[in-house]
């Protein structure tokens, strides 16, 4: 994949360095709702927030008139303009120092580190890398890099590599209720997760799309549940292709050495998302 030279047309470099600061309270109410959504026991005030549950906090509180047709916040402020492209959360990475603590305020400092246009097999793709630094009571907790891709409307990919042999495995069949509740608890208005006519007619998917962050959460916690005595150091993940409503999703992984694991999520058509977990030695 080679970078194109049409960045000047989009003025992409103007967004590099954009910064915003968001404060939120890691409130127990939302924590309980996420636990109910995922079907797990809820931690309590004063306890660590489970990894990746921070995605339900620090969300922009916008009026409906400030959302685009797809349900995302209108871009062109902090984020670059979409220019008729579909926006996707393609993957990311996190480096953990300490967890956020439930019941205390926290801050997320966000900076656009890079914006680049590349030419892929389906046409022009715009990749945006956003760095988030999370602090609580003046202490740095962890750093996240989020990878966003803007792509031209094209039919989604349906097949991928066969899943490797797993050391641990569980499965879930996401329901429309799960997708709706995860959208609600993360304040995610993206219509591909709950609006069937929109996702099929406008964006070309076969059915409602399972959230990439939800799958990353399932993949990471599948690994953590298999190794409860290990301490999480880092996690990176990448979407391979979409999963949709009704897919029987396998959440799997394998240790490659004492401190590293490969994790993935697959369905009958192959790998959907893959990631790497690193534990503290």
PLM segments and residue spans:
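Short, surface-exposed helix-loop/turn micro-motifs enriched in polar/charged residues
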Residues: 44-47, 124, 231-232
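Generic secondary-structure boundary/loop-capping signal
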Residues: 23, 52-55, 64, 75, ...
């Amino acid at each position: 994949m080679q970078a194109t030279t049409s960045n000047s047309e989009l003025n992409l470099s103007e967004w590099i360095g954009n910064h915003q600061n968001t404060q939120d309270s890691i409130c127990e109410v939302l924590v309980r709702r996420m636990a109910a959504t995922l079907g797990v026991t809820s931690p309590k005030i004063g306890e660590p927030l489970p990894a990746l549950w921070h995605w339900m906090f620090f969300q922009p509180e916008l009026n409906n008139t400030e959302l685009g047709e797809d349900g995302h916040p209108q871009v062109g402020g902090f984020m670059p303009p979409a220019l008729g492209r579909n926006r996707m959360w393609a993957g990311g990475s996190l480096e953990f120092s300490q967890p956020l603590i439930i019941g205390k305020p926290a801050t997320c400092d966000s900076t656009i580190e890079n914006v680049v246009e590349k030419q892929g097999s389906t046409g022009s793709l715009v990749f945006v890398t956003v760095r988030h630094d999370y602090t609580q009571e003046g202490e740095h907790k962890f750093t996240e890099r989020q990878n966003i891709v803007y792509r031209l409307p094209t039919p989604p990919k349906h097949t991928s590599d066969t899943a490797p042999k797993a050391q641990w495995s569980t499965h879930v069949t996401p329901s429309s209720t799960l997708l709706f509740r995860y959208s609600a608890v993360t304040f995610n208005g993206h219509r591909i997760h709950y609006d069937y006519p929109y996702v099929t007619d406008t964006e070309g998917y076969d059915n409602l799309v399972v959230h990439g962050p939800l799958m990353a959460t399932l993949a990471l916690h599948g690994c953590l549940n298999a190794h409860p005595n290990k301490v999480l150091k880092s996690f990176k993940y990448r979407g391979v292709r979409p999963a949709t409503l009704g897919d029987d999703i396998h959440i799997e992984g394998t240790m490659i050495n004492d401190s590293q694991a490969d994790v993935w999520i697959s369905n009958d058509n192959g790998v959907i998302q893959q990631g790497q977990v690193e534990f503290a030695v």
